[in-house]
Design a protein with these regions (language model features):
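Intrinsically disordered, low-complexity segments enriched in polar/charged residues with Gly/Pro
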Residues: 6-9, 200-203, 224
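Intrinsically disordered, low-complexity acidic/polar segments
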Residues: 39, 118-119, 220, 234-236
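A long amphipathic alpha-helix within ATP-dependent nucleotide-binding catalytic cores
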Residues: 177-209
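Active-site loop/lid in soluble adenylation, ligation, and acyl-transfer enzymes
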Residues: 1-154, 267-296
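Anionic ligand-binding catalytic core segments
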Residues: 123-124, 132-181, 225, 229-290
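Conserved metal-phosphate-binding beta-hairpin within the catalytic cores
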Residues: 109, 208-229
Length: 296
């Protein structure tokens, strides 16, 4: 076991909206906090157990998809980590990961038309520049999943949707001569992962309407899944039972929180406890349905 002379001195090297990342020499330790963000803003509430759901659900999907693409996970057992992370507050929320050179694209895949995609479709029949068939209803399943990349925003900024061609140009700035190759790999891996996981989830009673992946390159230049994977934070999960296109669907994700914030614009980014409780109830329900286990 690694020892830490003064456990209080360990500080994250990067703090995202929800995650804290610590340097562990040749690896990183990613801690999913109980913070919740909506509309790219960190809310004032914390949602107890949320961080553990994110970490353990990511582990579940990482294990399931190793046949498609490797991932950055090394361990979620804090006994494998420095002593600092063996405090109770880190239990279940921490993941030791390989260091990657992260690619500057958020890889969004949509299997159903909803949210901002539905708003765009109603306006001009497209989603992120992709022309879709006429006559779609809100929440309809798309003929095929569509890939709609975006740039990665700094905290406080908004991600910007871009076309596939723009993603090539964006990647080319960071990886000269590799823009098209990496853009195509990101698209193809994103859709392959979504198709496999959406089929599995549907067999467990959950529709994955859309989700977001992030990828990086390992030391050998191989593409690897990073960040989180198919969690209620990065995805829209709907119950398959009662699914009915033509309107919005109930969800197992933070849509509860989003809906309340939209309905209460003078909210000061603070949720009522009732909405916090309903949100974690949905997260835990989704975890149990997908994994067959209660969260420890």
């Amino acid at each position: 076991m690694m020892r830490c002379e003064n456990m209080q001195e360990l500080k994250p090297i990067k703090e995202g909206k929800v995650r804290e990342i610590y340097d562990n020499g040749d690896s990183l330790i990613m801690v999913a906090t109980d913070r919740i963000s909506c509309f790219d803003v960190i809310l004032n509430n914390e949602v107890t157990k949320k961080g553990a759901v994110l970490t353990q659900m990511s582990k579940f999907w990482f294990d399931m998809t190793e046949d498609i693409l490797p991932n950055h996970m090394i361990s979620v057992d804090t006994k494998d980590m420095p002593e600092f992370f063996q405090q109770e507050k880190f239990e279940g929320k921490s993941m030791m990961c390989r260091k990657l050179n992260m690619l500057p694209i958020e890889c969004i895949v949509r299997g159903y038309i909803t949210g901002s995609g539905w708003a765009s479709y109603k306006e001009n029949g497209t989603v992120c520049g992709i022309k879709l068939p006429e006559g779609l209803r809100e929440s309809d399943k798309l003929p095929e999943p569509i890939y709609t990349p975006s740039t990665k925003a700094e905290i406080g900024d908004h991600d910007e949707n871009i076309s596939f061609e723009q993603s090539i140009d964006h990647l080319e700035k960071y990886f000269p001569g590799k823009g098209r190759e990496y853009a195509e790999k990101l698209r193809d891996n994103t859709i392959a992962l979504y198709k496999k996981c959406a089929e599995y989830a549907l067999s467990k009673g959950i529709i994955i309407a859309d989700t977001k992946f992030e990828f990086g390159l390992d030391e050998d230049g191989n593409m690897v899944i990073g960040d989180e994977m198919l969690t209620p934070d990065s995805s829209r999960f709907w119950p398959a039972e009662g699914y009915e296109p033509g309107h919005g669907q109930p969800s197992f994700d933070k849509q509860f929180a989003r809906d309340w914030l939209k309905a209460n614009p003078d909210n000061d980014w603070t949720l009522p406890q009732e909405i916090v409780d309903k949100t974690i109830e949905k997260y835990l329900q989704a975890y149990k349905m997908l994994t067959g286990k209660e969260l420890a």
